[in-house]
């Protein structure tokens, strides 16, 4: 960890020692800027029965540049496209060096709880969500069962 900036070391230590409920973020053994992340689907959301895998990468310019995050688990969500890219303001225009990895992960977890079809990345999913929200939520639940890891009982 010696070649990493102190900020990354501190954030990593805090993520491991004081994890966010429902979220794990483990640095990769070979590259400590790369994290394997899991996020549990929030209660009372179409994703509540699943655990989703993501990858998070801290660019060389971090914290001046936002982390790069994407879903590895296929998910039916208006703000996440087929490639796993996420439409989230804190990853784009609202990024600030004052924000941390845990803030980003909490924001992604909140996005699962409250999809926003009015600011979509997956236009087809957003259209479904707007036309028939209950049907879209049912499809999101179905995809969660098909593609996400099941939460332990």
From Swiss-Prot:
Keywords, in A-Z order: ATP-binding, Isopeptide bond, Nucleotide-binding, Transferase, Ubl conjugation, Ubl conjugation pathway
Function: Has a role in the DNA error-free postreplication repair (PRR) pathway. The UBC13/MMS2 heterodimer catalyzes the synthesis of non-canonical poly-ubiquitin chains that are linked through 'Lys-63'.
Crosslinked positions (Glycyl lysine isopeptide (Lys-Gly) (interchain with G-Cter in ubiquitin)): 92
Gene Ontology molecular functions: ATP binding; ubiquitin conjugating enzyme activity
Assembly mode: Heterodimer with MMS2.
Pathway: Protein modification; protein ubiquitination
Keyword Transferase: yes
Protein family according to the UniProt entry: Belongs to the ubiquitin-conjugating enzyme family.
GO cellular component: cytoplasm; cytosol; fungal-type vacuole membrane; nucleus; ubiquitin conjugating enzyme complex
Principal EC category: transferase
Cited Pfam families: UQ_con (PF00179)
Active site positions, chain numbering: 87
Further information: Present with 8970 molecules/cell in log phase SD medium.
Domain UBC core: 3-149
Gene Ontology biological process terms, A to Z: free ubiquitin chain polymerization; postreplication repair; protein K63-linked ubiquitination; protein polyubiquitination; protein targeting to vacuolar membrane
Name this polypeptide is given: Ubiquitin-conjugating enzyme E2 13
Reaction equation(s) it catalyzes: S-ubiquitinyl-[E1 ubiquitin-activating enzyme]-L-cysteine + [E2 ubiquitin-conjugating enzyme]-L-cysteine = [E1 ubiquitin-activating enzyme]-L-cysteine + S-ubiquitinyl-[E2 ubiquitin-conjugating enzyme]-L-cysteine
CDD domains assigned to the protein according to its UniProt record, in alphabetical order: UBCc_UBE2N
PROSITE patterns from the UniProt entry: UBC_1, UBC_2
EC number assigned by the record: 2.3.2.23
């Amino acid at each position: 960890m010696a070649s990493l900036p102190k900020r990354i070391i501190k954030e990593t230590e805090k993520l491991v020692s004081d994890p966010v409920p429902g979220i794990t973020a483990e640095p990769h053994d070979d590259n400590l800027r790369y994290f394997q992340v899991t996020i549990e689907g929030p209660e009372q959301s179409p994703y509540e029965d699943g655990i989703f895998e993501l990858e998070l990468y801290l660019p060389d310019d971090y914290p001046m540049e936002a982390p790069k995050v994407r879903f590895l688990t296929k998910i039916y969500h208006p703000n996440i496209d087929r490639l796993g890219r996420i439409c989230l303001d804190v990853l784009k225009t609202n990024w600030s060096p004052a924000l941390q990895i845990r803030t980003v992960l909490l924001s992604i977890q909140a996005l699962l709880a409250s999809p926003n079809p009015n600011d979509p990345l997956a236009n087809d999913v957003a259209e479904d969500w707007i036309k028939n929200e209950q049907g879209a939520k049912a499809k999101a639940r179905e995809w969660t069962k098909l593609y996400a890891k099941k939460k332990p009982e």
